[in-house]
Swiss-Prot record:
Localization per record: Plastid, Chloroplast
Residues where GTP binds: 47-50
Name of the molecule in the record: Elongation factor Tu, chloroplastic
Similarity remark: Belongs to the TRAFAC class translation factor GTPase superfamily. Classic translation factor GTPase family. EF-Tu/EF-1A subfamily.
Length: 235
C-alpha cells in the first residue's frame, strides 16, 4: 500500500539493485508497480559494487536488469545504469563533509547518479493554472499550533492565509491555511508537485481522514458514484 501511494506521485525513480546479488523477486514487483501507477522514467543504481571483484559479473547484473526493465515495457537499453557503493560514499562524506567528489571514486559515482537523474528524467510540467487541489495522505496534531494535513499538491497553488475547503467523507468545511511546510522548511506559497504539510485553523484531527481533499472553495463536488480503473496484481 505504501509503495503504491509513494510511486503514484513520482515523476521518476531510482531503482536500487544489489550489484553483488542481482535483481531480487521484489525488484520485479517494484518495477511492475512503478509501471502500473505511471512512473514514466527510471534510473538504475547498482549498489554494493565494492563487493564485486569481477567487472564481468557487474556487466551480467546490468544485462539482467536491462532485460527485466524491458520485460515491463521500460526501455532497458536506454536507461542509465550507474554502479557504486552507497555505504562507502556515505562513510567518506561522514569522515570529511568537505570532501571533493573528484578525490573519491565512490562519492563521484553518487554525483554521477544524480547527474543521470537530471539528464534522463525530464522536468515535469506542473498543472499550476487550475484551482488548488491536494489529496490528504496523513494527518497529525502539533501541540499549541493545530492540525496538519500532509499530501502532494495535485494542481494549482495555495498561499498562507488563503481559505480552502475540506471535502469528502464528511460534511464540507471551510478552513484557513495558517502555515505551509515542506521538508522542514517554512513556505509562504505551495504549488503543484510539492509534498507539503498544511496547518489548518479550527480543524480537529478527528475531522480529517486520509482520502479527503483540500481544494479551492467551490471548485469540486463530492460524489458517491464514480468509474475507476483497477489493477489486480497477482503473486
Amino acid at each position: 500500500k505504501n509503495m503504491i501511494t509513494g510511486a503514484a506521485q513520482m515523476d521518476g525513480a531510482i531503482l536500487v539493485v544489489s550489484g553483488a546479488d542481482g535483481p531480487m523477486p521484489q525488484t520485479k514487483e517494484h518495477i511492475l508497480l512503478a509501471k502500473q501507477v505511471g512512473v514514466p522514467s527510471i534510473v538504475v543504481f547498482l549498489n554494493k559494487a565494492d563487493q564485486v571483484d569481477d567487472e564481468e559479473l557487474l556487466e551480467l547484473v546490468e544485462l539482467e536488469v536491462q532485460e527485466t526493465l524491458s520485460e515491463y515495457e521500460y526501455p532497458g537499453e536506454e536507461i542509465p545504469i550507474i554502479s557504486g557503493s552507497a555505504l562507502l560514499a556515505l562513510e567518506a562524506l561522514t569522515e570529511n563533509p568537505e570532501l571533493d567528489s573528484a578525490n573519491n571514486e565512490w562519492v563521484q559515482k553518487i554525483y554521477h547518479l544524480m547527474d543521470s537523474v537530471d539528464d534522463y528524467i525530464p522536468l515535469p510540467e506542473r498543472d499550476t493554472d487550475k484551482p488548488f487541489l491536494m489529496a490528504i495522505e496523513d494527518v497529525f496534531s502539533i501541540t499549541g499550533r493545530g492540525t496538519v494535513a500532509t499530501g502532494r499538491v495535485e494542481r494549482g497553488s495555495v498561499d498562507v492565509g488563503e481559505t480552502v475547503e475540506l471535502v469528502g467523507l464528511k460534511e464540507t468545511k471551510e478552513t484557513i491555511i495558517t502555515g505551509l511546510e515542506m521538508f522542514q522548511k517554512t513556505l509562504d506559497k505551495s504549488v503543484a508537485g510539492d509534498n507539503v504539510g498544511i496547518l489548518l485553523r479550527g480543524i480537529q484531527k478527528e475531522e480529517i481522514q486520509r482520502g479527503m481533499v483540500l481544494a479551492k472553495p467551490g471548485s469540486i463536488t463530492p460524489h458517491r458514484c464514480f468509474k475507476a480503473q483497477v489493477y489486480i496484481l497477482k503473486k
